[in-house]
Amino acid sequence: MVVKVGINGFGRIGRIVFRNAIEHDDIQIVAVNDPFIEPKYAEYMLRYDSTHGNFKGTIAVEGSDLVVNGKKVKFYTERDPSAIPWSETGADYIVESTGVFTTTEKASAHLKGGAKKVIISAPSADAPMYVMGVNNESYDGSANVISNASCTTNCLAPLAKVIHDNFTIVEGLMTTVHSYTATQKTVDGPSSKDWRGGRTAAQNIIPSSTGAAKAVGKVIPDLNGKLTGMSMRVPTANVSVVDLTVRIEKGASYDEIKEVVKKASEGPLAGILAYTEDEVVSSDMNGNPASSIFDAKAGISLNKNFVKLVSWYDNEWGYSRRVLDLISYVAKVDASKA
């Protein structure tokens, strides 16, 4: 089944979700809303991308709408989500990627315009969070607003699940070495709530907070309170890497751990958790659609119960692909209950 999807917010994730949708057989983007971008500029921003290259296809503007690969995509410029007429295009599922409407109440405004479900492309304080390959099967169709969690949680959770299912995680700490994002500064500037975050992104390694590790406890309840973490923002434009250090109950050699992760990447988590023994660096992962790419040669163990694991992720491309995979999955569940 092909799911008709609308995107609210044509920023970094909104555009990368759109690009991914071109490669996704189950998804058709039928409408986009962004009050700060006019259609001609939206065409330009979709066509050219400094990180992921030029758009592979045709894009044009027809009136106030986009035409992508010969198909019309309605373009709206509404500030109020409740005023977007999603029903005009049959957009049943909405990607909420503004970064503004991240609560159930705020994101529910899309339902007034005819949307059936809203998927927030960010963590949410109160909407149920789902991570593909981890807890998506717990979705029962009852929630109209859900969250795809964060890019870091999508990298960490599948790996943590495999380790916990096989060796039982006692406790752990995570550091994500994370590329800079749009919220950071090009030069030193005011940032009253996060002084370090106000320093220039391209010149500094900047320690920062992240809720990604604690959020794993929401999608894997058994790990609630057992993981926490932090972030180091670094001067790279894209691709990040999780460093997960855990104490495990069932002792195992590093080779045994590698084998378990490799097996999972070829089985139930194929396409979500990937595995490599190549001598890779961050740029090699640019455009990788997996949520988490386990780097077998980068990890180390101190003993059979204490291990450091390393997993890469394209925090833009891989995450955006999961947003669409989640939509495809929930649409099938919803259809089965109709």
From Swiss-Prot:
Q: Which reaction does it catalyse?
A: D-glyceraldehyde 3-phosphate + phosphate + NAD(+) = (2R)-3-phospho-glyceroyl phosphate + NADH + H(+)
- Transmembrane stretches in the record are none
Organism this protein belongs to: Sordaria macrospora
**Which residues hold D-glyceraldehyde 3-phosphate?**
S150, C151, T152, T181, T210, G211, R233
| Full protein name | Glyceraldehyde-3-phosphate dehydrogenase
> What is a biological process (GO) this protein takes part in?
glycolytic process
The family database entries (NCBIfam families) matched by this protein are listed as: GAPDH-I
Main localisation: cytoplasm
Q: Which SMART domains does the protein's record reference?
A: Gp_dh_N (SM00846)
By sequence similarity, the record places it as follows:
Belongs to the glyceraldehyde-3-phosphate dehydrogenase family.
The protein's site described by Activates thiol group during catalysis is found at: H178
Q: Where in the cell is it found?
A: Cytoplasm
